[in-house]
Every structure is written in C-alpha cells, then in structure tokens.
C-alpha cells in the first residue's frame, strides 16, 4: 500500500506545487510510481480521476497528461492485452472528460490532440473517443440509455 500512498500523495497531488507545464522528470516519476502500484490500479485510476475532478482549471491538462503517460507506459511494459489501466480509465471516461473540459479555453486543443493520438494509436476504441471529441466541439456528453 505504501507504493499507492507514494503515488497519490507524493506524486499526483504534489503537481499542485508546480506551475504548469509539468517537467518530463516529474511526469516520469509519477508514471513510474503508478506502474509500481499496479496491484492497486483501481485506486491509482481513482486517484487520477479525483485529481482531475478537484484540481484548479490550469491543472486539468497536466492531469490528462498523467493519465496518458500511465496508459502508454502500461501498454508498452505489459502489452496491450495485459494493460489494466486503459480499461479502468474508460469506465468513467465521460465524467473525467467533463471535468477536463473545465480547463482554460486555450488548453482545449491540447485535450483534442491527446484524443487524436489515442485514436491514431488505438489506445481506446473509436466508440469511446468519438463522444469525447464531440464534447470538445460543444456537443453534450452521451447519456446512458437503458432498454427496459
């Protein structure tokens, strides 16, 4: 559990002490801590989601970069089939992006750039990414529809 505490307390929430943009060294440190805490991946993902939800607007995009870095490193290290982070992030991805889009308007293009890279590299399926791109264009987020 100490690797999880290191990730959440020391790495993730210490981002608030730095002025964006976040250095490559800091991002690498956060990513390594997340991968080290893979046994607690659900908590790692929840920590990132909570950070994005609660941080100041100027830290929204760095929060996305943390998410991106963790997913890419996990896929690189363990392979696409064994990556646990991307499937977990996708569970609440609409809500996470609703918070991300509360960033300064200049930062929205950075979010779209990450989404386009995810689409190009098949990090998430198109049916996950397309609604997020639509949200960037000002369309309302999709709602869950239940058939009775």
Name these PLM-found stretches.
Residues 1-148:
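Eukaryote-specific intrinsically disordered, low-complexity regulatory regions enriched
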């Amino acid at each position: 559990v100490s690797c999880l505490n290191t990730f959440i307390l020391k790495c993730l929430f210490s981002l608030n002490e730095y002025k964006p943009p976040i250095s490559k060294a800091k991002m690498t440190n956060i990513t390594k801590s997340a991968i080290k805490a893979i046994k607690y991946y659900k908590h790692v993902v929840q920590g990132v989601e909570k950070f994005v939800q609660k941080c100041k607007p100027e830290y929204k995009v760095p929060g996305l970069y943390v998410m991106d870095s963790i997913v890419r490193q996990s896929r690189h290290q363990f392979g696409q089939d064994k990556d646990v982070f991307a499937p977990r992030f996708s569970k609440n991805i609409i809500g996470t992006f609703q918070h991300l889009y509360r960033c300064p308007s200049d930062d929205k293009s950075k979010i779209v750039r990450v989404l386009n890279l995810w689409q190009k590299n098949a990090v998430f399926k198109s049916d996950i990414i397309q609604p997020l791109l639509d949200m960037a264009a000002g369309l309302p987020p999709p709602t869950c529809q239940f058939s009775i």
